[in-house]
Amino acid sequence: MKTMTGRLVAAALVCGGAFSGAAVSAGPDDPLVINGEIEIVTRAPTPAHLADRFDEIRSGWTFRTDDTQALEMDDFENSGMVFVEEARAVWDRPEGTEGKACADCHGAVDDGMYGLRAVYPKYVESAGKVRTVEQMINACRTSRMGAPEWDYIGPDMTAMVALIASVSRGMPVSVAIDGPAQSTWEKGREIYYTRYGQLDLSCASCHEQYFDHYIRADHLSQGQINGFPSYRLKNARLNAVHDRFRGCIRDTRGVPFAVGSPEFVALELYVASRGNGLSVEGPSVRN
């Protein structure tokens, strides 16, 4: 039977690198203050349901190099904000057979969407299920605007989610995991700890058991999603949560669930809950 370290070594070798067993840290004590005014909580007490897993929870920002961290501290340096500004124009633009814009129902985005990113995914009574921000956007487009759905992880959708996240930066993540959301949360937890692919790895393998170690050149974080959508220097674009989930499962040589699927919605709720208490940070900058 393979040991866990053996699995991670195998994963590194697939990518042409090697696993370093030494725990490291890239400026974890540096404060994140955006534009000199938006204070972001990047380290927080561990949520009760993770009390036996971590001493504290940490934003992915604390695992990045000083240079990468600095890019997120100024909106003029954060390339993700280019897409936020594009989405602001779309917010006010009428579309569809109804000729309506987002602003017609929700008003100014800074007011109408304030606080929303902090509590999603959430159980939506009218839908009878847990919904993501992306699903709510597409529901508005089809039912209220008479416009076609956006690609779930396409550039239009991801830019709009980044805009919605940006107006809540600094607010604490606070997704509900009890009541009608509990069964979805439990499904997400099951997926998180399930091993996938030929490398037989789970989300927890990298982001819980071996976080703060290196695998090849990647400094493993706790896998928090409070900073999504995230502008990655690696691919020079905004990246959506489900796109990242899909990539992680592919890295195990497994077959990922579909974006927007019940499985990924459940996983998103669970992973978001692991960051309860951190600040909404999107669009973040990562490697």
Swiss-Prot record:
Protein residues bound to heme c 1: C102, C105, H106, C140
Q: Which gene encodes it?
A: soxA
Which is one Gene Ontology cellular component term of this protein? Answer: periplasmic space
Q: What is its EC number?
A: 2.8.5.2
**Domain Cytochrome c as annotated: residue spans:** 74-168
Quick one: where is this thing mainly located? periplasm
Q: How does it assemble?
A: Heterodimer of SoxA and SoxX.
Q: Which named protein is this? A: L-cysteine S-thiosulfotransferase subunit SoxA
Q: An example of a Gene Ontology BP annotation on this entry?
A: sulfide oxidation
Q: Which keywords does this chain's UniProt record carry?
A: Electron transport, Heme, Iron, Metal-binding, Periplasm, Signal, Transferase, Transport
What is the similarity comment for this entry?
A: Belongs to the SoxA family.
Processing and modification events after translation: Cysteine persulfide at Cys-248.
Q: What induces it?
A: By thiosulfate.
Q: What does this protein do?
A: C-type diheme cytochrome, which is part of the SoxAX cytochrome complex involved in sulfur oxidation. The SoxAX complex catalyzes the formation of a heterodisulfide bond between the conserved cysteine residue on a sulfur carrier SoxYZ complex subunit SoxY and thiosulfate or other inorganic sulfur substrates. This leads to the liberation of two electrons, which may be transferred from the SoxAX complex to another cytochrome c and which then may be used for reductive CO(2) fixation.
The record's active-site residues are C248
The kind of enzyme this is, by top-level EC class, is transferase
Query: Where do the annotations place heme c 2 binding?
Result: C203, C206, H207, C248
State the deletion phenotype: Unable to grow photoautotrophically on or oxidize either thiosulfate or sulfide. Thiosulfate:cytochrome c oxidoreductase activity is zero in periplasmic extracts prepared from cells grown on thiosulfate plus malate.
Per its UniProt record, the required cofactor names are: heme c
Which InterPro entries does the UniProt record give?
Cyt_c-like_dom (IPR009056), Cyt_c-like_dom_sf (IPR036909), SoxA (IPR025710)
Entry-linked Gene3D superfamilies? Cytochrome c-like domain (1.10.760.10)
The record's subcellular locations are: Periplasm
Residues that, per the record, bind substrate: R244
